[in-house]
Amino acid sequence: MSSQNLNDNPKNTSSAAEDKKKQTSSLKLAPIPTTSPWKSSSPDSNTVIPVEELRDISKTAKPSKNGSGSIKLTSNTKWTPITPSVIISGSKDTNSKSGKNSKNSKTNKKMKKRGKYNNDINKKDFNGQTNSTSEISNVSNLESKPLDANAKVNIHSSSGATANGNIKRITNNNNSTNGRQSRNYQNRNGKTRYNNNSRHSQAANNAISFPNNYQARPEYIPNASHWLNNNSRNSYKQLSYFRQQQYYNNINYQQQLQTPYYYSMEPIFKSIESIKNQIEFYFSEENLKTDEFLRSKFKKANDGFIPMSLIGKFYRMVNLSLGGDPNLILASMREVLQHKETNHLEIALGSIEGAQKNMADDFNPLENYFIRRENWAEYAMESNFDENDDETEKYNIEKLLGPNDLDNYSYMGYPNFFPSNENGKKSQSYDQGEISRQFEQNLQIND
């Protein structure tokens, strides 16, 4: 049985290969589909549309430029355009514009009438110049004469009505005309004489008394007649304004002379006070504990004195002294000596050995002054006690200065250096101009 199965196996394999060949030869390509599988399977889809109709459809399918978003209608009805009429609800009249125009025309007519009326009045006024001048002169004579008790009745009865009528006429004419016309008209008719006389009489009667038995002269106000004719109240206010202004200026005249002196001295006071405080700070215990530079300058050969010319070159001293003005530093040194008991500082007068004498322009007055602290030895370094040190500069100290030795540099100018008599009393006849000149020499401020 086993041998038969072995013989049958090759036959079976050959038959299977033949069947596969037959299957492969029977397969063919499918035909091209005539209809799209994604479209509906309606009988109309199989109809063929000619090319000419497709071209017509593409032309009609293009949207129009004007009506791209409009709705297309398939019916055969025709539509005609409509012209809409806008209707606004409200109570406004349709003839509002015409009403405004009519109002404007009315105002224009009124302005023309006023202009004609003013021109007529001006013509009448210029024609009747002689009458107006005579009437005004009568009124001025009536007011200038003193009125008795019996004469008052006659004036009011006979000429009062005419005078009042003339004054009313004048005021009405002035109010109707322009400012320039009224001024010219007043000058031609001689009204300025009447108004100036009344104004001078009022100013003379109303003279203002000032302090120190001074009376102000009445001021002249140009074109005052225009104000007096138009409105008496305005003229009174104008006169009072000028009088008050003169009174104000006369009282404050002395104060204006004093205030510049006060304000010009204020920065000097602040500068001197700040320099004094800065010098006291340099030689204070708090600063000397940390300031090794100043401690190195306390030499035993110079008895601990430091030249003020060196202190004046410090950055803060230059700024506080308004650019390094030595006069301000000398004035602050005087203040330091005035507070000697509290700051424990000493200032001496002397010179530097071997120093060249500078020209007058280059001379620094601080080179002749030296400063130290009373207990300077406590803060001096060990190397400063060598007296044979040739590198250190040596100072020739002449004397220690007292609180009154620097009075010539006082910021007040003349506190304690008045010239005295033989009895030691201060002279009362000291020239104030000399004092001011000395003060300007001592305090030359850098502008």
From Swiss-Prot:
Lineage, top-rank taxon, reads: Eukaryota
Q: Which GO terms describe its cellular component?
A: cytoplasm; cytoplasmic stress granule; cytosol
Q: Where is the composition biased (Basic residues)?
A: 106-116
Compositionally biased region (Low complexity): 89-105, 164-184
Alphabetically list the UniProt keywords. Copper, RNA-binding
Q: Do you know which PROSITE patterns this protein is assigned to?
A: HTH_LA
Quick one: where's region Disordered?
Answer: 1-143, 157-198
**Stored InterPro entries:** La_dom_prot, La_HTH, WH-like_DNA-bd_sf, WH_DNA-bd_sf
GO MF term set:
mRNA binding; RNA binding
The answer, when asked if Coiled coil is one of the entry's keywords, is no
Q: What else is known?
A: Present with 861 molecules/cell in log phase SD medium.
Q: What is this protein called?
A: Protein SLF1
| Organism, scientific name | Saccharomyces cerevisiae (strain ATCC 204508 / S288c) (Baker's yeast)
Ranked from the top, the taxonomy reads: Eukaryota, Fungi, Dikarya, Ascomycota, Saccharomycotina
